[in-house]
Amino acid sequence: MKFKTLIFSLSISFFAGLMYQCQVSKNSRANPSKEVQQLVDYMVGDFSSQAQSVRDSDFYDIRLHIRPIWKNDASNHWLYVEQATAAAEHKPYRQRVYKVEKEASGGVKSIVYTLPDPEKWAGKYKTPEAFDQLKPSELSLREGCTVFLKKQKDGSFIGATQGTDCESTLRGAKYASSIVTVTATELRSWDQGFDEKGAQVWGATKGGYEFVKIK
């Protein structure tokens, strides 16, 4: 009888432990998804570096617009990103599409793509449904330019590109790097280009641009 009681107790302990492990596993899978949504919510909006440009003339007054696109794709988060000087918002100098998803290590990654015929999409952050005419398969992946981010204790996300595989030819550069911090009210981005010897040839030297969310 004592032997049966022992077996029963062990069985209860085993199944309780198994159920706990399943719950932990379930939670560990769910948390990254919540972090992805939180990061996307932080990123979507209109941003300005005007305040920084007033404080420091080494920085330009830049406008950054980020909008969700392809909302019918329930399994992925796609963002259209447009960047232009405040003096020429109708002529963006950078247009990208980001695919934001959970990363295998538990963080979040933002995969970077370029658009075909980017001029056609200039200003389309105002009407993001226009991207329904475009398919994800028509985008071009920016190899090595993915930004890997981790959520911090204060709720912000901090991350960067990895290695030297994000190709750039601007001003004699060989590769580019990005260091990013995202909060509910601000997006900081430090983009730099380096030549084959590792010397910086473009980008801010003091630190990143500080984009304050204005809408």
Please place each PLM-identified region on the residue numbering:
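Calycin-type beta-barrel ligand-binding domains and close structural analogs
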Residues: 32-46, 50, 87-215
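Short, solvent-exposed loop/hinge segments that bridge or flank secondary-structure elements
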Residues: 32, 36-38, 49-74
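A generic structural signal for short, non-catalytic loop/turn and secondary-structure boundary residues
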Residues: 12-15, 74, 182, 204
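N-terminal glycine/threonine-rich, aromatic-flanked beta-hairpin/loop signature
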Residues: 64-93
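Short, charged, low-hydrophobicity "junction" segments
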Residues: 20-24, 54, 160-164
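Residues at beta-strand starts and edge strands
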Residues: 60, 75-77, 106, 185
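Bacterial Sec-dependent N-terminal signal peptides
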Residues: 1-30
